[in-house]
Amino acid sequence: EISLNGYGRFGLQYVEDRGVGLEDTIISSRLRINIVGTTETDQGVTFGAKLRMQWDDGDAFAGTAGNAAQFWTSYNGVTVSVGNVDTAFDSVALTYDSEMGYEASSFGDAQSSFFAYNSKYDASGALDNYNGIAVTYSISGVNLYLSYVDPDQTVDSSLVTEEFGIAADWSNDMISLAAAYTTDAGGIVDNDIAFVGAAYKFNDAGTVGLNWYDNGLSTAGDQVTLYGNYAFGATTVRAYVSDIDRAGADTAYGIGADYQFAEGVKVSGSVQSGFANETVADVGVRFDF
């Protein structure tokens, strides 16, 4: 069985003092298409593979070529993936819940380097031998994640740095908890990073959450992000503040809103200020298919 899914988005993006000779405000867009193939045995074991095609404004034509494939097998709550895998740190719940705007961005995200699913074709060839293994297990509201990434599997392991990650999350109708830990994140020696998050849904319309990050070797140090959202009918208002343990850094913050036109179609906007007091803003439309 073959299926297609993805999304398109387009709108205005503003970055204060983007660069010498560069416009601060541009039209920003993306088209993402996932090609997913699955089959199931008589015993109920599912085998699957995924390829992604993605174009962002500014990409060369090669940017729309398929990325590296991901393969998986799943049975009774256990999924084992190989290839271009979703890593534990990038997959755990809550870590991206402060994001806002049609581009889904936030200064409240982790400021560290770590491996994640590679969405695009790598024209440089740097990822030709990148490979990983990931295992997930789900039961009774608990999700467990384990991942391993070798950035170049053809080179002796003593000459490259491999990333190992573990994570878990749990949720009921009101409370969500999550945690993750990764060693040598992003293939950087001794770049050990961590995350702990909690969220409380105080009614059907509103949620508040608190995330803590140890950003490893990043100059950001420890980071705390407080965020919340509240829905008024078809409109959802979002806000966050984030602080890092770096001398002279400003407190980052953002406020945004979504309006749901229909299922899978929304207009979103945000205004955010970063750790260097830089201002970014966006407004645009996203539609899922």
From Swiss-Prot:
Q: Does the keyword Transport apply?
A: yes
Look up and give the membrane topology term: Multi-pass membrane protein
- Name the job this protein performs: Forms channels that allow the passive diffusion of small hydrophilic solutes up to an exclusion limit of about 0.6 kDa.
User: Which SUPFAM superfamilies does the protein's record reference?
Assistant: Porins (SSF56935)
Q: Where in the cell is it found?
A: Cell outer membrane
Keyword annotations for this protein, in alphabetical order, are: Cell outer membrane, Ion transport, Membrane, Porin, Transmembrane, Transmembrane beta strand, Transport
Quaternary context: Homotrimer.
Q: What is this protein called?
A: Porin
Q: Could you state one GO cellular component term attached to this entry?
A: cell outer membrane
Q: Which organism is it from?
A: Fuscovulum blasticum (Rhodobacter blasticus)
Pfam family example for this protein?
Porin_4
